[in-house]
Amino acid sequence: MGGGQVKNKYIVLFVSFGWSIYKGLDVIAELAKMLTNDYRIVVVGTDNYVDEFLPNNVISIHRTQNQKQLAEIYTTATVFANPTREEMFGMVNIEALACGVPVVTFRTGGSPECLDSKSGIVVEKDDVDGMKDAIVEICERKMFNEINCIKRAQQFKGLDKFNEYIELYKNRE
């Protein structure tokens, strides 16, 4: 899997630019209450308004400097979670997979089509308990490996930014 753990904690990553209820901001707050101290939640793409909404045990990153920095953040994650309620196509899912990180997402929009049985878990829309269970299963059972995630992402290589993420992943130190 991606980078995995920091100080014996599983890293659960969320990335969006324009966080809202539609993107699952409330789900992140719920998961922060439900997951044990073995998990560290990191949310990228926040702003001051979002920071006020998030619990204190969530790490907030406003913006990344560039795609390389974002790819580095992806590779530190044990799992990428996408609680979106409406998504045309889950490009953030592909970005995570390209960095070797398995994905948990709701069955909504194009997000489920990004995954296969070797790269992540799809849960029913708004099933926060199901998302929590999938996160725990991925982290504790180590059921997905980064090679399978990258292979899945390669099926989408015609999409913008795909090749850049693969190269950044290959060249990481």
What residue ranges belong to the model's regions?
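Conserved donor-binding/catalytic core segment of Leloir-type glycosyltransferases
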Residues: 3-23, 29-33
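Nucleotide-activated donor-binding/catalytic signature segment of Leloir-type glycosyltransferases, i.e.
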Residues: 45-68
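Short acidic/histidine- and often glycine-rich active-site loop of Leloir-type glycosyltransferases
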Residues: 52, 108-122
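Conserved acidic donor-binding segment of nucleotide-sugar-dependent glycosyltransferases
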Residues: 63, 117, 121-128, 136-143
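Short alpha-helical donor nucleotide-sugar binding micro-motif in glycosyltransferases
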Residues: 72-77, 165
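Aromatic "clamp/platform" in nucleotide-sugar-dependent glycosyltransferases that forms part
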Residues: 85
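Short hydrophobic beta-strand element within catalytic cores of glycosyltransferases
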Residues: 102-105
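A charged, aromatic-enriched C-terminal amphipathic alpha-helix characteristic of glycosyltransferases
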Residues: 143-171
